[in-house]
Amino acid sequence: ISYTATGDFAAIMAKASVLYKDIDSDFADTCLEAAKKAYSYLEANPDMKGYTNPEEIVTGEYPDSGKADEYLWAAVELYIATGDNSYVDAINEVLGGNYNKGLGWAAIGTYPLYDLAKADGIDESLKSAAKDEILCQAETLLKSCEKSNIFVSIKNFPWGSNMNIANDGMLFLMANNLEANDKYLEYAQRQRDYIFGVNGTGYCYVTGYGQLSPVSTHHRPSQVLGETMPGMLVGGADSGLEDPYANAVLYGVSPALCYVDNSQSFSCNEVTIYWNSPLIYLMTGLQYTGVGICWDS
């Protein structure tokens, strides 16, 4: 059991209780009770560290030393689900300190901010502060993207850079939902366009789409089938050259071009849930807003 996973569980169960309340009230009650128990565990174990692999586990680690964002998310969702003001002190404590903001798998603090900003029947000062923070993040991101000749915020492309870009698209959509702004919609589209081929490599990073897309993914089910399954987003450019194959063939290449379509390159061509899910959000959000135009470069 990790503190961070327990916080995630509490948040998701609380959200589920709200979503299922009018569909299956018994299940919703079960979810809410589970959320409260998980939150009680967090409260009883404040000194518990974040997550690192146990000694006997040698596969890739998903470390998370910052736990305040998960605690915040749990408190926010339980506050929204119950209306219990006892959670407000915990929320304010985290918001007044340092916590990891973001939409990834480790830094998740922007999710609870967005839910606070959208919620009804809650403390108005909390709601306003959350909205202001989301808009501040979006404005900072917008300025960074506008300085780029490929309209993305990344300069040194990390492992899973496409996740970062899809997450940026999510943030623009979230901000637009809170305060309509054509620039947010424009740059949400630009993040989508990058993923679908408007990038230095010319690759559409979603398998099975476009004239040039990955055909040799680091994806075991596809390797068993003998061909890459369509509809999967790969990690994309990684200037860290973090596997032997990429290091051998991409050394000295510009950061945005550090991509190779080869199943041995797990740092470039891996497929994961957590960089496909933000792309689904981005595509669905753009469809929901009815935005289908192509912006002039």
PLM feature segments, named:
Residues I1-A38:
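A conserved hydrophobic secondary-structure block that centers on an alpha-helix together
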Residues D26-T30, Y51, G292-D296:
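Short, glycine/acidic-rich hinge or "gate" loops at secondary-structure transitions
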Residues K36-S40, A44-D47:
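Hydrophobic, small-residue-rich alpha-helical packing segments that form membrane-like cores
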Residues M48-Y51, T59-E61:
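Flexible helix-coil transition and linker loops at the boundaries of alpha-helical arrays
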Residues L95-G102:
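Solenoid-like repeat scaffolds
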